[in-house]
Amino acid sequence: MRIRSALTALAVVLAGLVAGAGNSAAAGTTMATTASPYCGITWGSADKSAGALSSAPLVDVRTGRHDCYDRVVFEFAGPVDGYAVGYGETWTEGEGLALSPYTAGGALLRVSLRAPAYDDSHVGTVPYRVGEHAANLLRYPTLRDVVFGGSFEGYSTFAVGVRARLPFRTFVLAGPAGHSRIVLDVAHRW
């Protein structure tokens, strides 16, 4: 009788373990399924940098809205491929003044372009002064502000205010004509 009770108890325990293992396997399958990235974006939010210093001056800054991201384009009168972009405080070039108090947005991208915003005679090539807003971003889903931080010793700085810390990418495009562009895209969400 004792053996029969022990075997019955063992059978109940084993049945419970087998049932639990089946549920765990099903739960594991459910947990392994992840949502696909927003618009296929896999950029991340880590710092990005590339290229070398150039003497081709910055001549234009413009923005654009796309379905999955907002864009800032920096155009140069010649070949430029140097930049460093990352989240954090941005300082004016040559003065060291923090731009965060003057830049709208929940997060701040510091953009350092490895090219001047002045020509060979040291005359400014963009219409902005240090601290001025370079774009009207009304109705942009992600971008909140683009503030010129100045140009000093061949480097030009911008503070780009965004809604939150979001994935971004930076790349270089040739043209039009002999110009080049550094492009910054910031996703609308993760």
Question: What residue ranges belong to the model's regions?
Answer:
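Secretory targeting and sorting signals
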Residues: M1-G28
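Short linear recognition/processing motifs and adjacent strand/loop elements at protein termini
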Residues: A27-W190
